[in-house]
Amino acid sequence: MRTILKAILLMSLCSSATAPAMAINRANHDKKDGNIHEEETNDSTRHQPLTESGVKLNEVVVTGLTGSQKLKQSPAPISFVSARQLEMQPSTNIIDAIAHQPGVSQITTGSGISKPVIRGLGYNRVVVVNDGIRQEGQQWGDEHGIEIDPASVHSVEILKGPASLMYGSDAMAGVLIFHSAPTLAKGDMRANFSTGYQTNNGLFDYSLNFAGNQGGFVWNTRYSGKMAHAYKNKYDGYVFGSSLREQAFSQLLGWNYRQGHSHLTLDYYHLTPGIVEGERDEKTGELEIPEGYDAKSYGKPMPYQQIHHYKAVLDNSWFLGDGNLKFLLGYQQNRRQEFEEEENPKECGLDFMLHTMNYDLHYLSPEMNGWKFSTGINGMWQQSVNKGSEFLIPAYHLFDYGVFATVSKEIGKLNLSGGIRYDHRHLHSEALREEDDAESNDSGLNDSFRFQAFKRSFEGVTGSIGLAYEILPDFNLKLNLARGFRAPNISELSSNGVHEGTQRYELGNTSLKPENSWQFDLDLDYSSPIISAELSLFANRINHYIYSEKLADENNQPVLIDDTPAYQFTSGDARILGGEASIDIHPVEHLHIGNTFSYVNSVQLHQPSESKYLPFTPAPRWVSDVRYEFVCDGKTFDHLFVKLQMDCNLRQNHYFAANETETATPSYTLLNMYAGTDVKLHGKRLLSLYLSGENLTNRAYQNHLSRLKYLDVNQVTGRRGVYNMGRNFSIKIVVPIEL
């Protein structure tokens, strides 16, 4: 496989990176020449300033819940992250890059692994869409991140709230849609090189991209790499096990023609992150580090994970009159391995192999008297196999499908939209009888099996209805009511084993029921040249909310299995309230003062005080920044800006306290600074330069959603767990090449 990948990479680089980023993702499909390409503009307009005005963002065409529509016409709450914003934001992974958005958080395991959280809900409640299909890895796991190369992402749509209507089970919290760069116009070829460095963990990354369109034949080739040693903070020093290495390759080949397009995308992603165990010396309180270990080594410290993700997507689109028929077929292979034995470094403990086939067929009708209709079917088939010497979940087969129909109507300044969907999922879990038990117990009793075979089927009806109304030219109102559905995942139903990455013994529950939710959203936004403001409020009711609870014995002491704290999945009803507020003021030209505030209140109903709040509820967060854009002559420098930011995370007293599953988290404030500019030569952009300093005061802090917060106690200081990254400076250079 390595030989094949190297050969593909060599051929691609010889012919070989992305088109320069546009600030707003506008993919146009020109029926005259069949091209899907960026709007043809000169370089200065193509590379927009950092922040778009509210007026411009309202004109962005997004996927939404009922098909493509302008952002201001979508009743569902949607945030849009432009290419320019992604380009200037220092990060260690793609979720880290968007976690600054209001209502978006991340569950982290060190600096390299992040899981998305939307309005307090994460894991299998957030669907990730990339290359047009839902990304399927091992997203049920605490320390399993998203297998997407950040450099390959052109823009991001963040759908907040139930989106099961279009995306089926799991889209209860929302959807993250990662868009690749649109194909270029005929005759256009561009290359791109970017590189960056971060001082705290020595993170070095680079990306090469080459894209073009010759006579309708389109291609887009990218190769990226990244490596980082252990990060450090004021309390822990260098954190052993937090290093990582990453490689990614993608290749798009296709044909744009008058009546549509056919594109084949091939992706390969390889991540090798360390595992932070947080064990400490009882006398000194310092983190234990193997003898001879170099904290600045880019090697693989034991224990570590290894993730391989392969993906192939065939994307076809045809115009049928003024309607559009779209068919996507995808295959993904995800393999996750955990290596933990010094004596046998090549022998892995946990080894999951997941195969997924995705399919999506839908039709969008032509507009008729302001009405638009769409209908379709999508779903997936999965097979999971255990290949390691340790087991956490059983092997299983899964098949699901969902049929849906949507409708939208524009009546003057009023836009109405809605739809309905039916989902069905069947899961077949296989039995596993461990060899040791089989040799010592021939009675056939249940305790000789690690996993019992079982079959479960789940079904649900979901939908949404909403409106967007232009009260005034600068003032909009949105209302939306949506129903969500999520079937329990394999881990929640039948896990039984020690998970090295989480330091837990996890137990499933085969009697769990599907989650169902109702969410109501209210959104008000105002945009003018001087001030832009938005208020988004939501109320969410979830039945049969599934979570893991730490087990305790009759003396209220933790239950240990194999010397590891035991957790079991259970369920209850939940109510989540909250919202986001933002205001951006332009008191004088070129000066921007922005403030955003996010709040989530997650409560379990009919529970005692120690179980009142849901686990992993993000703390209230206030982000304030002042940005100044300098006036440049445009000959040498352009889009020069400086931004000072205060990131204030308030104290989180709402935590799941039962059996000390969670604890309160103190407040903290981070001071950050960013600067950037385009450097030009002979009127063309030579390169873009970005500088940043984050956590400038070197504050020692723990985010409430950091899993390292619950590792061993420092017996000397009394502090528990490992702290987040300290002061970090970064530099990034992006060099576009027009051919």
Please name every model-derived segment.
Residues 137-139, 152-154, 165-235, 242-249, ...:
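Outer-membrane beta-barrel translocator/receptor signature
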Residues 228-230, 240-246, 260-321, 325, ...:
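Flexible loop and strand-edge segments within Gram-negative outer membrane beta-barrel domains
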